[in-house]
């Protein structure tokens, strides 16, 4: 039997709303008192009043007595919910996946289904564990070695970095995995030394400017597979690894690589160009010394580096980075010691500019039977003696592209300060320069036109350095730690060699530099597939695909040793 409590203490939600509004508008009770009497919050009472004034509230009696029926979930949807929970996805993530498939369910419905299936709630997790950053961005997987490529069996992966696999046969040919082992590079429990090395190499081959930009490839399993990983290591891991290397590791790595390349006949080794390059550093607290930066025409803080280039093949074959001012003059002797370990019995002709070393070191080179061609520094005394020269001889430099092919020369034997004996001096004018050049050499037998032409081609090493700066971002110095700088330069040398090896197999593009090869052949999308343990790369139709099709891939290594000797094939549409 109903009494007054039916009106003063309503139970049903619709009636509580009605009595609350009546008490506020008719009985003029304050908001807080109405809220306490009918079990609402003060804010909810104000919301009811707002909805009542605007006619947006329904005060009719609910037919289901405030007990709405539960959303029915099909067995198919229920199975998907269970499967996704087994992958440790939250109810909210499951709702998003269902929404993508056109199934609209609430989070509470998903939680009810999970409870009915006896699946416990997930413990509270941080955003990082969930796989999201503070800004809601997805967190990539942790990099780790692939035990076998069978983990990718049957998958088809599209990547903008698939072009790096074109270097895989040449990497195998150079035996870089064996070079890493010979150098004794360190690894970690999760990532081996070879995998780290190939990760750095992949970034170099793609022209990546800094380690921080590796995030562009954080979700690319194709590049990860190239390095024998699920994905490439993150920026912190790469930077930390480069700091773990010491000079002994780098010396072994460089020597093992150059010895391997030399055995393959990549270097002529008869003439070698040498040059310094200052890698600028702009850090506020830089501890690096100041060196002359020729490209900028001024002295600035930076890392002084050395490059040695085979004059015939134009390949870099030696680098150094940990060079102080007082050590710069003796670098020619340090290089010679390295070259004797690599190519015993071969004495090259060294080409360098006037400021590369001292006359005393030139004397030491002469005593060891090493020929050199360099410039003599012009002074007032030399320029005054030039006026006495009258018997000039015109020669022809065998270079069809050279603008000034017929300069005038004058030969003589001259002594040098701190040099035992005399050197052959060739004064050259009419070569497009305002002032004449004074070439000095200890080669007494070579024809003068050959000596002049050989020195004139020293610009090749400058072009090589310019290419390293432009494409391999040599000047993107992110650390004053010179060990890290030297490692980056060695990786530049290796990447440059691989681009050269690719160019030698591209008909009509043999003389092209790395930027052009990357633009025409490497850059762009490709699809990688793994089937029955075989790796296949498919590249979409591009203008230069016929050139790639003509490469004799069958004569190059067909298996990738660091991927369990998995066979690899290329398809160009």
Task: Name the predicted role of every residue range.
Residues 36-47, 99-112, 189, 220-237:
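Short, basic interhelical loop/turn and adjoining N-cap
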Residues 214, 447-482, 487, 491, ...:
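Short amphipathic alpha-helical "interface-anchor" segments enriched in bulky aromatics
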Residues 70-105:
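A short, amphipathic alpha-helix used for macromolecular contacts
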